[in-house]
């Protein structure tokens, strides 16, 4: 209970308080730019009369003034306004606005109103006489500085903007008010820039972090008296860190727009100067400028560029800048309403002196969003997109593991581009205008999103090639028990995390496949990553080792970091024996680099966060030389022996290999499976490939022969068009291929694996006959059941029984 209460307190600042003057926006019945409608009961409650002027407050500190009228059909908690008023308040339908009486509104002496250039194209004549004069004469209209409004006359609407009012910021335009409308029209681009300013509702996927930032920034800037009353200093700085593309800079801009504070942006590298002392003076100027315009927010983007660790930097300038930043942050006056925000994606390379309380008080991790966060981000990016009915955003959010906000934005634009490509045959690029029907038919479908998903990969993993492989269970013949165990290991924690919570258990972390070469160990790892739609990072053992001291361990760290940031993720170590040999025996190998790599892998496996679904699969055909520390439970806790296939498995492998090939009916795969005892999966694949090759060779030779015959007797060329000479792979091809068939694994090797499996079985499976006292009767049947992966029982591999 305490936990849920804590949750509530953490995001309490985001909850909107209920007040009688907070109303939900609804579409207006009459299309008047200066009128809003309320129910009579709500007007009585707010002590408003019909025709009163009210001030409305919307999002991003936007406000406007209107005349209020009563409307009996309007529900009590709603307010009706048309699109013009909504745009002036930056709100949409069903958003919330606050209404207050505005008794101090005066008649205006002078107002300046300019048209917006786009809407006046092709219009000549006096705009004032045709548009503005009739608009303001018909009613006493209240206007607010910065408002836009549309006037319809002479067959076409024109949009105007209120540039100045006297008195500021709002007044009523009466008959004696002087209206100036001289000057150049306002450019639409400038207008849209202010409209497209970012607000809190444009940020998704970091609700908790936003709550922390709001209480750190909005409370000191808006209500410093709160801190005075309690007797503590308001916080001074916030450091936001996290991977690129999660929205750190976006949050800073949104905070500035929503608080209405002066926003001063410092891009880290821009401060640097070649002249001595100038870099520090640039920093001082920025702080002075912000203090003059308080309340203000200083935002330092990429702070690691100007405040690196002083003991690590060689340049004197960087050290001086760090010292200057420290003294500036300490010297900020108590009274000045100034907050410093900084963003970086390398928090550990910042000087530690900056990270103490009183400078950057709070460090906020803006991490990779979860499925709910991704859904929020997708909704924000698709709110202006035309989507087809079949688009399921929840499905896309669930499948886009490891994507940050920037990746999701690119996903949406890629899907939209794909939709345009599909309609390309209807669009003529030479034409000036595109047919309205084509534009109307554009709608992004789920298929477009599916295509975009194949093209986009999480930005955290761009440099390591992460692919979700396209191998499925059908590509793997046999090994049913192993497949089942793998599904339990990887698919269950990803798809049914609630069950693990219910039974209070953490899913196991890793598996080691061992067995003779060519039995499908690598193939299994690929298939499991594909089946549960997890990201898949394949680590080739020898690639991790480099000639530089300490670099090999850093490579291991990086790979694990990337896997964690793209969870759920399968890390596949192929040829594990090359990097995880038993320690102590590696004398004279680059100063014990291999030992250090193993130590790093061990610590990374232990330190893998409990909440991250990262699975490790190792594959080796030399399990005897692997360090025993890696094989303990909690690291690679499940050792799965992948034996040579038995009769049924061999038949399944042959079928899997030949499932796309045309096969003659007389080819008896069961018989081939029976005679190929001791063959591995790779050997069987080789037989199939050789049979296919022989069929292809025969088909090509027949074609060449036919061409020659055709050239010799051209007259009867038409009659010679008979059937395909080699329509399918016949038994003759297989008989020929079997002459070259060979076993790649000797009996001797297999005995080694069997021995290793046996010793493991004995060392681990000592409790096969374990019973609780007094319960012998209940479980007598299951007493002799070995685990599915016990290679000791002959049922699993009857090759040499």
From Swiss-Prot:
Report the domain of life of the source organism. Eukaryota
Stated consequence of mutating residue 437 to A: In ter94-26-8; arrests early in oogenesis
**EC number of this enzyme:** 3.6.4.6
Q: Where is this region: Disordered?
A: 764-801
Q: Which GO terms describe its cellular component?
A: autolysosome; cytoplasm; cytosol; fusome; lysosomal membrane; nuclear membrane; nucleus; P granule
User: Which amino acids does the record list as binding ATP 1?
Assistant: 244-250, 345, 381
Query: Where's it found, cell-wise?
Result: Cytoplasm; Nucleus; Cytoplasm, Cytoplasmic ribonucleoprotein granule
In this chain, composition skew of type Low complexity spans 776-785
Q: Enumerate the Gene Ontology biological process terms.
A: autophagosome maturation; autophagosome-lysosome fusion; cellular response to virus; dendrite morphogenesis; endoplasmic reticulum membrane fusion; endoplasmic reticulum organization; Golgi organization; larval midgut cell programmed cell death
What InterPro entries does the record tag this protein with? AAA+_ATPase, AAA_ATPase_CDC48, AAA_ATPase_domain, AAA_lid_3, Asp_de-COase-like_dom_sf, ATPase_AAA_core, ATPase_AAA_CS, Cdc48_dom2
Catalytic function, reaction form = ATP + H2O = ADP + phosphate + H(+)
Tissue specificity comment: Present in the mushroom bodies of the protocerebrum and in the glomeruli of the antennal lobe. Present in nurse cells, oocytes and sperm bundles (at protein level).
Please provide an example of a Pfam family that matches this protein in its UniProt record: CDC48_N
Record SMART domains? AAA, CDC48_2, CDC48_N
Chief subcellular location equals cytoplasm
**An MF annotation (GO) of this entry:** ATP binding
Annotated positions of the Phosphoserine modification: 716
Keywords from the named record: ATP-binding, Cytoplasm, Developmental protein, Differentiation, Hydrolase, Nucleotide-binding, Nucleus, Oogenesis, Phosphoprotein, Transport, Ubl conjugation pathway
List residues binding ATP 2: 518-523
Its biological purpose is as follows: Necessary for the fragmentation of Golgi stacks during mitosis and for their reassembly after mitosis. Involved in the formation of the transitional endoplasmic reticulum (tER). The transfer of membranes from the endoplasmic reticulum to the Golgi apparatus occurs via 50-70 nm transition vesicles which derive from part-rough, part-smooth transitional elements of the endoplasmic reticulum (tER). Vesicle budding from the tER is an ATP-dependent process. Involved in the ubiquitin-proteasome system. Important for oskar mRNA localization and/or anchoring during oogenesis.
- Description of how the protein assembles with itself and partners: Homohexamer. Interacts with tud, vas, papi and AGO3. Interacts with Npl4.
Q: What family does the database annotate?
A: Belongs to the AAA ATPase family.
Give the protein name, as stated in the record: Transitional endoplasmic reticulum ATPase TER94
- The species this protein belongs to is Drosophila melanogaster
Q: Which gene encodes it?
A: TER94
């Amino acid at each position: 209970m305490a936990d849920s209460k804590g949750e509530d307190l953490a995001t309490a600042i985001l909850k909107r308080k209920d007040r009688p003057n907070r109303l939900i926006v609804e579409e207006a019945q009459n299309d008047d730019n200066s009128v809003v409608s309320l129910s009579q009961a709500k007007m009585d409650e707010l002590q408003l009369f019909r025709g009163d002027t009210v001030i409305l407050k919307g999002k991003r500190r936007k406000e406007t003034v209107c005349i209020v009228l009563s409307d009996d059909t309007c529900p009590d908690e709603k307010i009706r306004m048309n699109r013009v008023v909504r745009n002036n308040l930056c709100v949409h339908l069903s958003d919330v606005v606050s209404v207050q009486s505005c008794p101090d509104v005066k008649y205006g002496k002078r107002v300046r109103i300019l048209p917006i250039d786009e809407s006046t194209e092709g219009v000549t004549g006096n705009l004032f006489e045709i548009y503005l004069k009739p608009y303001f004469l018909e009613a006493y209209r209240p206007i607010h500085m910065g408002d836009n409004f549309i006037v319809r006359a002479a067959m076409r609407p024109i949009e105007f903007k209120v540039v100045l009012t006297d008195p500021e910021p709002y007044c009523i335009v009466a008959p004696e008010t002087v209206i100036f409308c001289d000057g150049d029209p306002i450019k639409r681009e400038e207008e849209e820039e202010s409209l497209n300013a970012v607000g809190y509702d444009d940020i998704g996927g970091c609700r908790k972090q936003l709550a922390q930032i709001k209480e750190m920034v909005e409370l000191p800037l808006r209500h410093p008296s709160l801190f005075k009353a309690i007797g503590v200093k308001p916080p001074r700085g916030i450091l936001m860190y996290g991977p690129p593309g999660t929205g750190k800079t976006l949050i800073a801009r949104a905070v500035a727009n929503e608080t209405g504070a002066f926003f001063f942006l410092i891009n880290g590298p821009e401060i640097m100067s070649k002249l001595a002392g100038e870099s520090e003076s640039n920093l001082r100027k920025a702080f002075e400028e912000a203090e003059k315009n308080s309340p203000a927010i200083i935002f330092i983007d990429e702070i690691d560029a100007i405040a690196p660790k002083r003991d690590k930097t060689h340049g004197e300038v960087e050290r001086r800048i760090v010292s200057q930043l420290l003294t500036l942050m300490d010297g900020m006056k108590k009274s000045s309403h100034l907050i410093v925000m900084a963003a970086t994606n390398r928090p550990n390379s910042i000087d530690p002196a900056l990270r103490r309380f009183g400078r950057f008080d709070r460090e906020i991790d803006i991490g990779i969003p979860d499925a709910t966060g991704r859904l929020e981000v997708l909704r924000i990016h698709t709110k202006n997109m035309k989507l087809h009915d079949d688009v399921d955003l929840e499905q896309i959010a669930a499948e886009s593991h490891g994507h940050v906000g920037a990746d999701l934005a690119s996903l949406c634009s890629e899907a939209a581009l794909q939709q345009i490509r599909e309609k390309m045959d209807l669009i003529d690029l030479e034409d000036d205008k595109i047919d309205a029907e084509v534009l109307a038919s554009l709608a992004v479908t789920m298929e477009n999103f599916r295509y975009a998903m194949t093209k986009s990969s999480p930005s955290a993993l761009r440099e390591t090639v992460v692919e979700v492989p396209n191998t499925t269970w059908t590509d793997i013949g046999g090994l049913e028990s192993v497949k089942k165990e793998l599904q339990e290991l990887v698919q269950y924690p990803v798809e049914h995390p609630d069950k693990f919570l219910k039974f209070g258990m953490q899913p196991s972390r890793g598996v080691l496949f061992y067995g003779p070469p060519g039995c499908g160990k690598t193939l299994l790892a690929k298939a499991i990553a594909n089946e549960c739609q997890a990201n898949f990072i394949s680590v080739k053992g020898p690639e991790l080792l480099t000639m530089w001291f300490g670099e090999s361990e850093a490579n291991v760290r990086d790979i694990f970091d990337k896997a964690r940031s793209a969870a759920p993720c399968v890390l596949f170590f192929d040829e594990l024996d090359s990097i995880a040999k038993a320690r102590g025996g590696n004398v004279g190998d680059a100063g014990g680099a291999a030992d250090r790599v193993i130590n790093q892998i061990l610590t990374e496996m232990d330190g893998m966060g409990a909440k991250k679904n990262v699975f490790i699969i190792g594959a080796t055909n030399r399990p005897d030389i692997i360090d025993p520390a890696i094989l303990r439970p909690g690291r690679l806790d499940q050792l799965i022996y992948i034996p040579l296939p038995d009769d049924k498995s061999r038949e399944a492998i042959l079928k899997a290999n030949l499932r796309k090939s045309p096969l003659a009916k007389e080819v008896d795969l069961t018989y081939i499976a029976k005679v190929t005892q001791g063959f591995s999966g790779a050997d069987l694949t080789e037989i199939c490939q050789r049979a296919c090759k022989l069929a292809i060779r025969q088909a090509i030779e027949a074609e060449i022969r036919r061409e020659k015959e055709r050239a010799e007797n051209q007259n009867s060329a038409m009659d010679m068009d008979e059937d395909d000479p080699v329509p399918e792979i016949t038994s003759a091809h297989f008989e020929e291929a079997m002459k070259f068939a060979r076993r790649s694994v000797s009996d001797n090797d297999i005995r080694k694996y069997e021995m290793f499996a046996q010793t493991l079985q004995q060392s681990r499976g000592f409790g096969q006959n374990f019973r609780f006292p007094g319960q012998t009767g209940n479980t007598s049947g299951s007493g002799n059941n070995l685990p599915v992966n016990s290679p000791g029982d002959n049922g699993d591999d009857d090759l040499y029984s």
